[in-house]
């Protein structure tokens, strides 16, 4: 057994670039600037683990307390004393209760420890010989340090895995959004503190089993009506969810190098035991994830998940400030909303670090990470900012639809009957038109739209770049057989129709009206 609070088990990078391992007790050290996990999902998991520690053991009482810590630093002695209050929940090893392991001894067959990795090939994948990218037996032996973080990461991201295997309280493969400083030399604790919320009081010893579910018999979910909700648990369990019943086999070990970090260890762990019908979470809103809700009355809030192609700039507004279209409204993560109200002196630029798996039920299709520009704009200007961005995104979305329709008209004699997969075009479109949008976003974030000539210029450049992209892309994809006169006529007709339909868009007229209004203000 070892304590996850005192053991030097977290790989970190110092200001000089040196890598070493630290214990959470050393988090107050300003010389430590980042974590250093070899896998991005473990890196993201480690950030969430440490944020959870800060939130649970050391949360500020109010905004003034938050600012005091930000400016004066984590006080080492107070931090270590705060961690002692949750020490019973942070023991890792074979003796129960143990960190994120089932309270009971599981009567199940042993399976490979690779099952702690979300992207490891499952039984059906192996049976059908479909492990093309992540091969079977790639991850068979983990050191205890990597095992602890892999266990936390799979519990917090838990995807669907068969009958009775519960997903995380955010669903399978949730997206996480953290506020991060542009200055990468900030100490690690400051990067974490940006994502800590104020709370009126810290938990008592008696409340620990309601926060850390492995400290008590598992509230299993074989029968309906036995879900864990914010009403029958502590709100801080959001950081320590345990949907999977897992037990690590500490008796079957061997010496060698860890398949995750590469370090030598005398007792590498190789097997785990799983059991279905673990904790079923209902009604939780995780502070580190954004949510989406259908505009239909009574629709639930659902956490955003990874998606094919990752995030695009059409998603930025919803993740940073919240947004709404004719189908859904997006609510930023609670930590992002809290950050938007803070003011820093001197001003500090931030970005949003968004990451998560794109899951197809139990199958991990891809891991995505994005760094999006965050916002620190005056509340009085937010409405104007939102209106302009929503117009611009609506123009981009509508224009993409017109481009796809025009390509079908150009490619097929009966386009209405033609079927096709435009996913590659969708991804390329949002990626290749992002640069001008990023410039516009930056202009809008820095200046009030109705007072800025820069915004007017950026709007014009954005619309011009979008228009040019549409026709360059159409020509590249459609004009591939100029010797076929009949096809050429069809292509040119489709091109003229694209130009006509683009110009007729109501949202384009709204954007041009906006540009004209700005021009009048500038000339006044």
Regions flagged by a language model, labelled:
Residues 143, 152-153:
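Acidic (Asp/Glu-rich), glycine- and aromatic
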Residues 143-146, 261:
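Short Cys/His-rich metal-coordination motifs, predominantly Zn2+-binding knuckles/fingers
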Residues 135-138, 252-253:
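Flanking scaffold residues of small Cys/His-coordinated metal-binding clusters
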Residues 1-126, 153, 158-524:
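Extended alpha-helical scaffolding segments
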